[in-house]
Regions:
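Extracellular/luminal beta-rich ligand-recognition
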Residues: 111, 121-169
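Short carbohydrate-recognition loop motifs
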Residues: 52-74
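Extracellular beta-strand elements of beta-rich domains used
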Residues: 213, 232-235
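Bacterial N-terminal signal peptides
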Residues: 1-11
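Short coil-to-beta strand junction motifs in C2/discoidin
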Residues: 107-114, 145, 228
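Extracellular carbohydrate-recognition regions
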Residues: 12-47, 129-136, 245
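Extracellular beta-strand ligand-recognition surfaces/modules
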Residues: 114-116, 171-181, 185-223
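Extracellular/lumenal carbohydrate-interaction signature centered on repeated Trp-anchored short motifs
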Residues: 78-89, 182-185
Length: 245
């Protein structure tokens, strides 16, 4: 359960629980996203208010609408794509406003109106003592280790597109800025990213298997609010070799 890794890294001491109130997998948004036979589920973080996720039509598009009110949670899906089969990831989002106080390099201000989250396996013998301890804590809590690495695509207030931000809690979470500043607010933005190239840019090594995909809008650290719409998330070049766990 790679969501557990995010919970441990966020300072949570309990296991994330399934926070679903509806089956998100039956929505047109989920059916257009990668691996249509898998389940997109909403997961809460212990001690955190949950952001609200709901399917909607936005500007003629199928979308997942998200509202965060001093909250943080994720909609995610478990997948498996072997390193040799990694291709691209396609996603889109629309953001009406940035979080003015946010700074993803600071623990106390690490919020973002949009995040696309990719979780990976890897050579765990290379983990630092601190990261190994975090992984052991996750294993003790859940019976499963945290991901070896997590890559997030984010929209940053000031850092330039292409910047890599290391998570203030652990260097096994890194954020790649794909949008910056206010210039493209209030419009749909579409992306296709090379997973391998972006992982290598962020971590300086080749990726392991991709084991999870998620979307996340959070405003808990800044005690603020955020809204966003996400289009379907797709793995167009890897779909033939993926499998839901």
């Amino acid at each position: 359960m790679w969501m557990v890794g995010l919970a441990v890294m966020a300072g949570c001491t309990a296991v994330p629980k399934d926070a679903s109130t509806t089956d998100l997998s039956v929505t047109p948004w989920a059916q257009q996203s990668s691996l249509q036979d898998g389940q997109w589920r909403h997961y809460a973080l212990p001690g955190k208010a949950s952001s609200q996720f709901a399917y909607t039509r936005k500007d003629g598009r199928d979308a997942m609408a998200v509202t965060a009110m001093s909250s943080a949670s994720m909609v995610r899906k478990q997948v498996r794509v072997e390193p040799t089969e990694l291709g691209s990831v396609r996603f889109s989002w629309k953001v009406p406003e940035l979080i003015a106080q946010a700074d993803m390099a600071l623990r106390e201000a690490d919020d973002s109106p949009v995040r696309i989250v990719l979780a990976f396996e890897g050579d765990r013998s290379r983990l630092s003592a601190r990261n190994a301890a975090l992984s052991e804590l996750a294993l003790a809590l859940t019976g499963e280790e945290m991901p070896y690495a997590t890559l997030m695509y984010v929209w940053c207030n000031e850092r330039a597109a292409g910047s890599v931000i290391v998570n203030p809690r652990t260097d096994r979470i890194r954020k790649l800025v794909v949008e910056s500043g206010r210039g493209k607010l209030n419009r749909w933005l579409d992306y296709e990213r090379n997973i391998r190239a972006d992982y290598e840019k962020a971590f300086g090594e080749a990726p392991g298997a991709l084991v999870g995909i998620g979307i996340m809008t959070d405003s808990d650290n800044t005690r603020s609010s955020a809204r966003a719409w996400y289009g379907p998330v797709q793995l167009p070049l890897a779909s033939r070799s993926t499998a839901v766990r």
